Amino acid sequence: LINGYSPFCETFFDNAIAQKEDLVGQINKGWTVGKRLLQHERSGMSSLVGAQSRDPGPSLVDVAIDSIGLGPDDKLAEAETRHSIIVHNMNNTAFALTRRRTVEEIDGGQTPGPATSIFKMYGTELQQEKSTLMCSIRGVQGYGWQDSSNFDADELEWTRAWLGNRAASIYSGTNEIQRNIIAKRVLGLPD
């Protein structure tokens, strides 16, 4: 509810009985099936599938120019904000290229494997960073809530996106869990 909506739910099945023919995988091996489902979900979370179909919204540069303006040298007037945007855009481009390579590997028949944890974790961190920068660049106007007389629809939407993106590091396995998976299954570190 932090952003005004409730996308999460928890369902409990008490005294549930499953028929033998409805069993997925082996008896008492549900976590193995569950991990594979989470892997698939994480690959979707990190935009491995349909990455180009999403509208990314306004660019940080456009919002910064509108909110802060350009200096006499035609550069963004605030050097610190300019640096933050450049670093974010470079990281986002590197992530997009790595994501594209992985999509090509999947198209070639490879299974993404535990690397999806890296995509999920880093993708959500980039998403959170962008929404934080977007609100920060707008100053006070970037943190509107319900007062439509002082905030336009875009400003209210970006505040909700910023708050909603806090959940991105929780769903599909928290980023802390992703770090553990990466340590064990990608880097081969001991328990």
Where are these predicted regions, by residue range?
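C-terminal helix-coil-helix/basic helical segment that borders enzyme active sites and/or dimer interfaces
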Residues: 93-150
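A general structural signal for short secondary-structure junctions and capping/turn motifs
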Residues: 1-4, 135, 160
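Glycine-rich phosphate/cofactor-binding loops in nucleotide/flavin-utilizing enzymes
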Residues: 28-50, 138-191
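Short amphipathic alpha-helical interaction patches enriched in hydrophobic/aromatic residues
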Residues: 42, 68, 103-106, 110, ...
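Secondary-structure transition/capping motifs at alpha-helix termini
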Residues: 73-79, 108-110, 189
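Glycine-rich beta->alpha junctions and the first turn(s) of the following alpha-helix
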Residues: 1-96, 168, 184
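Generic, well-ordered alpha-helical scaffold segments in large soluble proteins
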Residues: 37, 60-67, 101, 105, ...
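Alpha-helical scaffold segments that form or flank carboxylate-/histidine-based iron centers
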Residues: 80-88, 113-122, 159
